[in-house]
């Protein structure tokens, strides 16, 4: 089940706070129809029971469209519902422990801001890295900035795929060209839009150009 580089091309990371009256299910489905290649459920403010219910619904949706479904941080839930994988940050469970819990066949993504963190995550069994924030972001107030030079250095230092995250939108994707990334992870540039399908389609086209 390990992810291929192409699965990371346009990585949708959910945040229901941007949705207004729309349901997360419909927004995620529209984003997949628009070209999202992988989905991460990241809902920090949901109660456990509601998060679990949402996770199962989005998991079924992703199965229907043959898109990998990952859960942010909640390793126990990811194991319980047999999600395709889990993504953890530097302040979550240590990557090596996560790998032991989820087993060798599930996808493990790890956030990194430095070469040291990136190499450590790779050694611990990460399948890909999420590196950022590469641009100012309104989604995570505490996100440390990562320069494009650092992003490039991390891509050169590791053997696993790297996804850029943080403040990515149509107007800045092409500035990531030549960095070595294999895709971008996007939150508000898809899920804050009235038409997530059109937003994803536009981002997909630009991302394909940026990683050539």
Each predicted region: which residue ranges?
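Conserved N-terminal beta1-alpha1 strand-loop-helix module at the mouth
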Residues: 1-93, 100-127, 143-146, 153, ...
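Short beta-strand and adjacent tight-turn residues that come in two discontinuous sequence segments
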Residues: 41, 88, 131, 136, ...
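A short, polar/charged loop-to-alpha-helix boundary motif
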Residues: 93-94, 137
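Glycine-rich beta-strand-to-loop/alpha-helix junction loops that act as flexible
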Residues: 131, 163-168, 184-188
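Phosphate-binding beta-alpha-beta segment of Rossmann-like dinucleotide-binding domains, i.e.
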Residues: 136-144
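Internal alpha/beta core interface subdomains
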Residues: 179-183
């Amino acid at each position: 089940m390990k992810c291929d580089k192409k699965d990371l091309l346009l990585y949708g990371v959910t945040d229901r706070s941007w949705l207004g009256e729309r349901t997360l299910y419909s927004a995620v489905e529209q984003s997949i129809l628009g070209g999202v290649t992988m989905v991460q459920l990241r809902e920090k403010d949901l109660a456990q029971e509601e998060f679990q219910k949402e996770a199962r619904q989005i998991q079924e949706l992703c199965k229907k469209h043959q898109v990998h479904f990952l859960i942010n941080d909640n390793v126990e839930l990811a194991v319980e519902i047999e999600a395709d994988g889990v993504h953890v940050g530097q302040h979550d469970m240590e990557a090596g422990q996560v790998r032991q819990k989820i087993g060798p066949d599930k996808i493990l993504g790890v956030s990194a801001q430095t070469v040291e963190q990136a190499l450590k995550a790779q050694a611990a069994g990460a399948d890909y890295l999420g590196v950022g924030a590469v641009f100012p972001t309104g989604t995570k107030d505490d996100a440390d900035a990562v320069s494009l030079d650092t992003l490039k250095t991390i891509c050169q230092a590791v053997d696993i795929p790297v996804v850029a995250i943080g403040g990515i939108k149509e107007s800045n994707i092409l500035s990531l060209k030549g960095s070595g990334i294999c895709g971008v992870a996007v939150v508000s540039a898809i899920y804050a839009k009235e038409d997530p399908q059109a937003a994803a389609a536009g981002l997909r086209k630009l991302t394909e150009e940026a990683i050539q």
